[in-house]
Amino acid sequence: MLCAIYRSPKRDQTYLYIEKKDDFSRVPAELLASFGKPQFAMLLSLNERKSLATADIEKVKSALVEQGFYLQVPPPPESLLKMHLGETKA
């Protein structure tokens, strides 16, 4: 299974995976509007991989088949205050 990966010019560390390069027909218009003009990053074969750096490969494959796309967003920022408070309680 091949997929094309695009980076968002509007949102840092946000990527859109689609089944076919430059075919955004299954991606909702609202998502594309908030994502910005997709910037091509790479073509990737998911069959030859067991994992991805920051996304669950099985979720990516499933979303591509069911929805035609997968949106990868960055993890939430760490709360340094919560970390500090947790350390002071211990």
UniProtKB/Swiss-Prot annotation:
Coiled coil region boundaries: none
InterPro entries: YcgL-like_sf, YcgL_dom
One matching Pfam family: YcgL
Protein's name according to its UniProt entry: YcgL domain-containing protein YE2368
SUPFAM superfamilies (UniProt xref): YcgL-like
Ranges of residues in domain YcgL: 1-85
Superkingdom of the organism of origin: Bacteria
HAMAP family xref list: UPF0745
